[in-house]
A protein has these predicted regions:
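Active-site neighborhood of HAD-like aspartate-dependent phosphohydrolases
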Residues: 2-51
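Acidic, Mg2+-coordinating phosphoryl-transfer loop and its flanking beta/alpha structural elements
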Residues: 171-211
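Conserved H-loop
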Residues: 42, 134-138, 166-167
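Short, acidic loop-to-helix structural element flanking the phosphoryl-transfer center
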Residues: 9, 87-115, 121-125, 153
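A short, structured active-site edge motif that brings together acidic residues
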Residues: 133-148
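A metal-dependent, Asp-based hydrolase signature
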Residues: 53-87, 100-107
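Conserved Lys-Pro-Asp/Glu-containing loop-to-beta segment of HAD-superfamily phosphomonoesterases
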Residues: 12, 150-180
């Protein structure tokens, strides 16, 4: 674990979803390759697709078809991607194996936790429910729950409001630079989940996080629960 600060004043742990709590890459990568096949294109390797999972449909369509928002055909490809993804949300998506005991420990000590993701609630809600997380989470905020999404702090502030916890008593754990940016903008400690997707930008050591967690159980040490 990188980062020396230890939190003894945390009343709510907020997690990103994709790449932090759950491994959704197999279903998102599979959707991208299904759409490529529909356009007569060969499959891309899983390793080529996985880093962009955290960027959602925009990132997946971008790497699969080499297009960006504003390019001709982007919106049609994005909509087709989302339609296909909606049919396989839980085909292979699972809670990361090492995250399971982490959540169990948080529950056992009575430290509440929640989810803040840029994924739209029409996808987030069935995934969270299907994986048995909905009844356990103190709050679930999706990408369309508030007027702005991460890196804006609004979703994190809404999660804190729903849980009745001051932002300064929350921490946020995510696997993307925008997670660190959003957490700090909300007045929270921000930690990197280094087991996640991480994108293809600057190295995580340059993100300015309060700590880099190499594996989920390191969060327990950071919280002084071990």
């Amino acid at each position: 674990m990188t980062g020396q600060h230890l939190s003894t004043d945390c009343n709510l742990v907020l997690f990103d979803l994709d790449g932090t709590l759950v491994d959704s890459a197999p279903d998102l990568a599979g959707t991208a390759n299904d759409l490529r096949a529909a356009h007569g294109l060969p499959a891309l390797s899983y390793d080529a697709l996985r880093p962009m999972v955290g960027s959602g449909a925009r990132g997946m369509v971008g790497v699969a078809f080499g297009v960006a928002p504003g390019d001709a055909g982007f919106e049609a490809l994005r909509d087709a991607f989302l339609d296909r993804y909606a049919q396989r949300l839980l085909a292979h998506t699972r809670v990361f194996e090492a995250v399971v005991p982490l959540l169990d420990k948080l529950d056992a000590v009575g430290l509440r936790w929640g989810i803040v993701t840029n994924k739209a609630m029409r996808f987030t809600a069935p995934i969270v429910a299907g994986l048995g997380l909905a009844a356990r989470a103190a709050t679930v905020v999706g990408g369309d729950t508030t007027a702005k999404s991460k890196p804006h702090p609004m979703p994190l502030l809404e999660a804190a409001r729903q849980a009745g916890v001051e932002p300064s008593h929350c921490i946020y754990v995510g696997d993307d630079l925008r997670d660190v940016q959003a957490g700090h903008a909300a007045g929270m400690s921000a930690l990197v989940a280094a087991w996640g997707y991480l994108g293809l930008g600057e190295p995580i050591e340059a993100w300015g996080a309060d700590a880099i967690l190499r594996e989920p159980n390191q969060l327990l040490h950071w919280l002084q629960l071990t």
